Amino acid sequence: MPPSPDFEAFSLTPIDQANGQVFFFYNISYRVRNEASALQTIHNAIDVLLEKVPFLNGEIAFPAPVPDANNVLIVRPPRAKSEDQVPLVQVKRHSNCALPVKKLEQSPFNVPSSLPLNGLFNPLAAYPTPNRPTPVIRFQINLVNDGLILTLAFNHAVFDALGAAVIVKLLAESCRNQDKIGMDGRLGIPSTQARVRSPLLALSSRLKKNNRARVDAPSPSEFSENISHRPVAAPPPLKDECFVFCAEKLQQLRIACTSILEKLHENQKSVTGQGDVRFLSINDVLTALICESIAQARHAAKHPYRDEKLHAKPSVSECLMAVDLRKFVEPPLPHDYMGNAAIPLRFEVSSQRHASPDFHRAVREVPTGLNTSFFLAIAKTAYTIRAKLARFGESYIDSLSSFLNAHEEQKAVNILPACAIVSSLRHIKTYELQFGAELGEIQAFETGIPWVNGSCIILPLCANSSDVAGSAPWNVRITLDESTMYCFKNEPALRWALLEQGKSKVLGPCDCKADV
């Protein structure tokens, strides 16, 4: 592989650095007829991609530290290679492995396998070695019995999920036409200047400077002393699985929730002063259903035996949903902006399922098979999500400031994980991409965060045409601790919303079931 052109080093934004150096992975499955030709196509495409976007072959490092200065991470051209450096592209063969793809019966759609993500497909570990330069991206081509899986590892300190999706789109272009990538007018090449001159850089830098004046962070010695005296419990074993939700059921749920918007508006306005909500999306109700089900599962996992005294006191859990800032900042960021531009939107869910009689009377029709109390909980949470999104353009600066401030305070306090952390990639049209004759269409696109308890990734639309998009299932990769996962998979609302083949009851060490 020829060396990529040099580029001018640039600093990462405060929001980039707040996400930390951790690698996320995109797994893209293809069925190929000629393995050698497919491999050559990918290698050539990566060469072209690096020629057009050379910083992708860069590395992240601290510049020479300056005393009493705000030392920031930079992306720079790679230095001399070391023997233990992970190659830019690796090829590995996996005996007795098949593509992690499942064909739905009587359906034109492929969905990802429900099995856990295979870490052997990743070119490097999720967490890089501390105090050493780390790569921006790495690729691994995994050869299996019926095709290949191209894994893209991207450093979250440089890209968010949408930024990494731009790389996939550029790679598809370079596979199709390796001489004219980015020259057809539909997608230009994002430059490093777009990052340096980004309004998000100026805004986040200003907010972080203001935050630093207010935060009294401890010295490194104080931090070490606090950590050494703090008891640390071993994290519970985690499980990740892809859940396939029925598009028709979710549409029924959205329509039913929309039918009580007026009542929800009256209730929420009196409680929180939230503005009016005119519509709910399927993304809203699915996020609400997932968060409500996980909250119930966590509550049930803590109290596996139905002790009324324990269940009498409901628990309130905080959930997070990633929101893209690209269209909110002024001027708006381009859609192909590769840097981090997502911050969390926070909302709460309660394990209590007792709605007022007025609410029950307002419900004209609950989808068959769904408990009325749980339906109302989903509707309320979906309303809260949509109301917060409607006001996000007015409040995102405060949210961004809080996000950056929390990053500063992680040195002083123990940041507890959320009940559920939802990110939606549904709108990314990955399956419509064409990768040329040797690779063809994507058979499945997978990603997840199997090391984060509560992470929920709504995967891209698994349809290669807008004509069938409305009936395409919703695929969600969810990671939970083992006991919560058992309870989650037995939640009635979840089983109702899944496609038929995923509805069987799961038996665990205890039959977990929260009160409804």
UniProtKB/Swiss-Prot annotation:
Gene3D superfamilies: Chloramphenicol acetyltransferase-like domain. Signal peptide: none annotated. This is O-acyltransferase ausQ. Its EC number is 2.3.1.-. In A.calidoustus, the austinoid gene cluster lies on a contiguous DNA region, while clusters from E.nidulans and P.brasilianum are split in their respective genomes. Genetic rearrangements provoked variability among the clusters and E.nidulans produces the least number of austionoid derivatives with the end products austinol and dehydroaustinol, while P.brasilianum can produce until acetoxydehydroaustin, and A.calidoustus produces the highest number of identified derivatives. Monomer. It comes from Emericella nidulans (strain FGSC A4 / ATCC 38163 / CBS 112.46 / NRRL 194 / M139). It holds the Pfam family Transferase. The lineage of its organism: Eukaryota, Fungi, Dikarya, Ascomycota, Pezizomycotina.
